[in-house]
């Protein structure tokens, strides 16, 4: 693997639209080198018997069965509103025309 240069770091910063001060270039160059060295270590791991996955833990949907239940009648619900207009709830206007 080729070594990361200050020019590489400046290019990545430019592509990411980051304004990276010159005094931080060396720091980021070193950090990127360490990251790439770690990735190189990961590439050496034998994963032939590991099945592909997108999550570290299995995710399942928790569902319940639908049950028919009684709900308050329409008129009772409308009567609970502070203001109503016919069969609708009346709410304060929030947008100008």
Swiss-Prot record:
Keyword Metal-binding on entry: no
Entry EC number(s): 6.3.5.-
GO MF annotations, alphabetized: asparaginyl-tRNA synthase (glutamine-hydrolyzing) activity; ATP binding; glutaminyl-tRNA synthase (glutamine-hydrolyzing) activity
Superkingdom of origin: Bacteria
Protein keywords: ATP-binding, Ligase, Nucleotide-binding, Protein biosynthesis
One GO term (biological process): translation
Recorded catalytic activity of this chain's protein: L-glutamyl-tRNA(Gln) + L-glutamine + ATP + H2O = L-glutaminyl-tRNA(Gln) + L-glutamate + ADP + phosphate + H(+); L-aspartyl-tRNA(Asn) + L-glutamine + ATP + H2O = L-asparaginyl-tRNA(Asn) + L-glutamate + ADP + phosphate + 2 H(+)
Family: Belongs to the GatC family.
UniProt function note: Allows the formation of correctly charged Asn-tRNA(Asn) or Gln-tRNA(Gln) through the transamidation of misacylated Asp-tRNA(Asn) or Glu-tRNA(Gln) in organisms which lack either or both of asparaginyl-tRNA or glutaminyl-tRNA synthetases. The reaction takes place in the presence of glutamine and ATP through an activated phospho-Asp-tRNA(Asn) or phospho-Glu-tRNA(Gln).
The protein's assembly and partners: Heterotrimer of A, B and C subunits.
Protein known as: Aspartyl/glutamyl-tRNA(Asn/Gln) amidotransferase subunit C
């Amino acid at each position: 693997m080729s070594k990361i240069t200050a020019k590489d770091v400046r290019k990545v910063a430019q592509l990411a639209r980051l304004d990276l001060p010159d005094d931080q270039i060396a720091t980021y160059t070193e950090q990127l080198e360490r990251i790439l060295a770690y990735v190189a270590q990961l590439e050496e791991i034998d994963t032939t018997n590991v099945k592909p996955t997108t999550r570290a833990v299995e995710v399942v949907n928790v569902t319940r069965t639908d049950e028919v239940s009684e709900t308050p009648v329409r008129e009772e619900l409308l009567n609970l509103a502070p203001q109503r207009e016919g069969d609708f709830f009346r709410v304060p206007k929030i947008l100008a025309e």
